[in-house]
């Protein structure tokens, strides 16, 4: 084994659990999709490591690679779907409690990405903006939108009044 392989193995072991956890949240808990995203993230990261400028933490850069891989897959999936067959899906709900994970999974992609990165993983708006290629104001407004949608989903009685 070469030094490069050892270094990669060390990085892989250090960052894969966090990437997988993020991928799970971004895919609404779809384990197979999350595994595919993480694998493609590592493939892409090894090809594009020269674009890592060291201006942010390596994990932040890897998270942005993962998010970009997911966005590309989402765009590709939309191109393959016939528009007339698309129907909005209501998140499943049981009578006793609304599952927070399901509520997060039901958020629109952009709002969910920012909510998860900010409120779950603790990234600040500047880092999120860099990862997603948006301005900080977009990150802030999408976070407010996500929180509002979650409040409505988790407290439907309050949303009606």
Model-derived features with residue positions:
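Pre-recognition alpha-helix immediately N-terminal to the DNA-recognition helix
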Residues: 7, 18, 102, 112-113
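Short, charged helix-capping/linker segments at alpha-helix termini
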Residues: 2-10, 21-40, 53, 136, ...
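C-terminal flanking helix
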Residues: 16, 20, 42, 108, ...
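Short, small-hydrophobic-rich alpha-helical interface motif
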Residues: 1, 19, 23, 34-45, ...
